[in-house]
Amino acid sequence: LWPAWVYCTRYSDGPSSGRSPRSRRLKRNKKPEEKRPRTAFSGEQLARLKHEFTENRYLTERRRQELARELGLNEAQIKIWFQNKRAKIKKAS
């Protein structure tokens, strides 16, 4: 057994009073069944999003609103799709 001060450094592998940085933090206010289901884009929606992405990797607010209206999606779905697409390309390179 080691004295308490041995475990007080941020580089220690020993036990600590805080949470492990690798542990997943669960949101206590949401139950798993309340999680919003993953959006399943139609082929037409995907083709349109991909086309828009080839034209411009970043959308203006106005263009995002237009796309959302034209595709029957909400703006957040459009925004997240573009963010994920940029992240995927960055990760691959």
Swiss-Prot record:
DNA-binding region, residue intervals: 34-93
Entry-linked InterPro entries: Engrailed_Homeobox_TFs (IPR050720), HD (IPR001356), HD_metazoa (IPR020479), Homeobox_CS (IPR017970), Homeodomain-like_sf (IPR009057), HTH_motif (IPR000047)
Gene Ontology process terms (BP) = neuron differentiation
Places the protein is found: Nucleus
Keyword terms: Developmental protein, DNA-binding, Homeobox, Nucleus
User: One Pfam family from the UniProt entry?
Assistant: Homeodomain
The organism's place on the tree of life at top rank: Eukaryota
Its main localization is: nucleus
> What SMART domains does this protein's entry cite?
HOX (SM00389)
For bias type Basic residues, the affected ranges are: 21-30
Location of the region described as Disordered in the Swiss-Prot/TrEMBL record: 12-41
Q: Name one GO molecular function term.
A: RNA polymerase II cis-regulatory region sequence-specific DNA binding
Q: Which residues form a coiled coil?
A: none
Family, according to the entry, reads as follows:
Belongs to the engrailed homeobox family.
- List the protein's name: Segmentation polarity homeobox protein engrailed
State the encoding gene. Answer: en
